């Protein structure tokens, strides 16, 4: 592959443009630099920025069918080989505090042995790990190592989020054992997060597996083995997601049963209260008809005696219900 001039890649509003020094570090790209396989370049762009969008649309370094994909058209994880280059779309956990983590961020990458072009709109939190390693001089030394480190960081963040969801399910199961029902919508949100993760992480696992099996010229055998390990690790995370989805279904049935039992218990209590007060209600209604005058109305102790009789009647009914084991 021919060398590339630094001036052909230096985009003014790029998030960053670095050259890998081959020793695990980076340096800012200069217009006078020469980009080749021994000194590859990583260009990271926000495709909504004006200069970045214009560069993506006009640069001759990218194949025509790659431009739209890097500009935000591709969202589902996939990998496509295009001559000497490879187009990769990946999804990662959203690290923004203003949005839910399951609203995944898309990152698109086109790379060959000398050039890495990655684009995004929202910040890709997992890239901070790779950037930190490069700034400390302990990062990848070539394009293949860069791709493996990025996929490893993405999988680490996905695994952490899956573990958080798993912990929430365990807490929810413990609360259900204590007859504590979660707030309305909590289980639905948890299930949605699991389903969204399953939807995007399954094809991403396939992307990793294909990268491990493809004989890409800029990936070594050791890097392919590492990529296969990453695919296997994400596969175990998907198995955990499937188990969690099944457990949320069981918990939904358990919550419905607990709510039904609580409703039945309240209905039963109200029925018993109605049974206790039914005789007293009948007597007060009968005396209140007042067609022939209220019995005992002219006696000064009439009302007191009537109240005592009502208390005795209510107590008798309650005692009968208790002995009948209804109370």
UniProtKB/Swiss-Prot annotation:
Its main location: membrane. Keywords: Cell inner membrane, Cell membrane, Ion transport, Membrane, Transmembrane, Transmembrane helix, Transport, Zinc. GO terms for molecular function: cobalt ion binding; cobalt ion transmembrane transporter activity; magnesium ion binding; magnesium ion transmembrane transporter activity; solute:proton symporter activity; zinc efflux transmembrane transporter activity; zinc ion transmembrane transporter activity. It is found in: Cell inner membrane. It is a multi-pass membrane protein. The keyword Oxidoreductase does not apply. GO terms for biological process: zinc ion import across plasma membrane; zinc ion transmembrane transport. The keyword rRNA-binding does not apply. It comes from the Bacteria. It holds the Pfam family CorA. Homopentamer. NCBIfam families: PRK09546.1. This is Zinc transport protein ZntB. The gene is zntB.
């Amino acid at each position: 592959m021919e060398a590339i001039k630094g001036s052909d890649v230096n985009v003014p509003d790029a998030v960053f443009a670095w050259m890998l020094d081959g020793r695990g570090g980076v340096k800012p790209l200069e217009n006078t630099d020469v980009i080749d396989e021994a000194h590859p370049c990583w260009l990271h762009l926000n495709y909504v920025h004006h200069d970045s969008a214009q560069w993506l649309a006009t640069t001759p370094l990218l194949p025509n069918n790659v431009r739209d994909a890097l500009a935000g058209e591709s969202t589902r994880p996939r990998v496509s080989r295009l001559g000497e280059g490879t187009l990769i779309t990946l999804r990662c956990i959203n690290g923004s505090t203003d949005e839910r983590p399951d609203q995944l961020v898309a990152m698109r990458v086109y790379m060959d042995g000398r050039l890495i072009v990655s684009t995004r709109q929202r910040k890709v939190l997992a890239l901070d790990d790779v950037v930190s390693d490069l700034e400390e001089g302990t990062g990848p030394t070539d394009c293949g190592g860069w791709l493996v480190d990025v996929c490893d960081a993405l999988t680490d963040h996905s695994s952490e989020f899956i573990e958080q969801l798993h912990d929430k399910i365990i807490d929810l199961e413990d609360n259900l054992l204590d007859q504590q029902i979660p707030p309305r919508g909590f289980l639905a949100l948890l299930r949605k997060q699991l389903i969204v993760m399953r939807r995007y992480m399954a094809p991403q696992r396939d992307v990793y597996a294909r990268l491990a099996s493809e004989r890409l010229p800029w990936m070594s055998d050791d890097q392919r083995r590492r990529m296969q390990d990453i695919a296997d690790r994400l596969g175990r995370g998907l198995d955990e997601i499937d188990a969690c989805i099944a457990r949320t279904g069981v918990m939904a049935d358990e919550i419905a049963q607990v709510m039904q039992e609580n409703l039945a218990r309240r209905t039963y209590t109200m029925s018993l209260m109605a049974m206790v007060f039914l005789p007293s209600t009948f007597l007060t209604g009968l005396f209140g008809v007042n067609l022939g005058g209220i019995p005992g109305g002219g006696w000064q102790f009439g009302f007191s005696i009537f109240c005592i009789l009502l208390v005795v009647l209510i107590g008798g009914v309650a005692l009968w219900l208790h002995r009948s084991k209804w109370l």
